[in-house]
Amino acid sequence: MSKTVQPLHQLPRPKAQFLLGHSAYFSKDPLQFLYECSHQYEGLVPLRLGFSKACFVFDPSAVMEVLRERTIFTKNTPGWRAIQTLVGLGLLGSDGDYWARQRRLTQPIFHHQRIVAYGDLMVQATDRLLQTWQDDTVRDVHQDMMHLTLEIVMQTLLSADLEGETAQAIAHALDMSMQWFSQQQKQGFLLPPTLPLPSNKRYFAAVKAMDNLIYQLIQQRRDSDADTGDLLSMLLQIKDETDGSQMSDRQLRDELATLVLAGHETTANALAWTWMLLAQHPQVEAQLHEELDSVLQGRTPTVADLPQLSFTQTVLKESMRLYPPVVLLARWSEQDYVVGGCEIPKGCVMMMSPWVMHRCDRYFPDPLAFKPERWQDDLEKQLPRGVYIPFGEGPRICIGKGFAQMEATLILATLAQKYQLSLTDGQTIEAFPSITLRPKNGLRMTLYARSNEG
């Protein structure tokens, strides 16, 4: 006997406004709205965003089904069309056969043996940041992490100096893109980005300035034919095994923009939230310092130390549970399709939230508590797939996952070995969901040099 399939519109849902549907609730506080939906309803929740059909998915098996079926549930959503204005048809912005080819071409540069070669560079950049830190001073640690991860990605990707013209143009375009995307998000992506509004003009001017310098750099590399050992050199050398073709300048530009955005913002924000959580939980911070002192004995960490820095890695894993770098994943249904016993209509925006999944008490007892020790008994292997998804899941899981994990661990170990950080009084820390999840007003912290480094 076949299982009954229920149409999406028949499922229970929150009360909607006449014209706006659920848009007003979603725009006001999307994380809280979806979190409340997950506590009031089951698995799949039909929503209406203006005149658009949507479905919030938080059943793990249904989440995995949506993320696995990449040809049925594509990224062709209004939000991703906005992101495409920055990353073009890079891995973040493409779909279908084109995406599959780009993923196949790009995958080799992120093999483990390649990325470990960048470990020393990551630590050296972190040491340069340490030289600017002083005991008993206040820093915006979020800005420090942004600056540091941008320096690392510029060096590993382009062998570029952070103070150089190309790096400065890219940094400006990224900053403008976050502001612009947030405005688009608040408007529900209803206004075409081509409208001659001042905010649109400023944003596209910044992207154009970045593009001009990136194309110049690509041309210089092609003319010199030099192998600088960075990721751009690898991308220039890669050939498609099926037909011997290589990436065009436009494809290279799109992948560079994608890798800078994904490799810079996400790691910086994950580290910023980690510093906040450590300051709020001194017993966890003390355990972290104990591991660093025992393993490193006061010396600079290396990639070879990573297997011994297990608690350091669980601290980051727990931080990304509570504050995932990306809080909302969206897909567009290209056809009618059954998910979790429910018929999803064509043209429906499927929304999944790592923020909500990671705070579910069914899988994480005391879900709002910061407890790195919960990961020490292979919890991740025991969880159903689709529950813990800080890097996404399925065929489109983050290609730079290994790079980001290595980078974050080395940065945290290098800095926490030398300093203890404390939150300054009087600041309001607010999680601000844009393309990534960042502290809205920065993160001001007082630095205290540690004297017991082993």
Predicted features and spans:
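Cytochrome P450 heme-thiolate monooxygenase catalytic core
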Residues: S2-L11, K75-I83, S94, Y98, ...
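N-terminal membrane-proximal hinge/A-helix region immediately C-terminal to the signal-anchor transmembrane segment
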Residues: S2-R101, V116-R128, A206-A209, Q335, ...
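Cytochrome P450 proximal C-terminal region
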Residues: K3, P7, L11, Y35-S38, ...
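Conserved cytochrome P450 K-helix/beta-meander segment immediately N-terminal to the heme-binding cysteine loop
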Residues: M352-L379
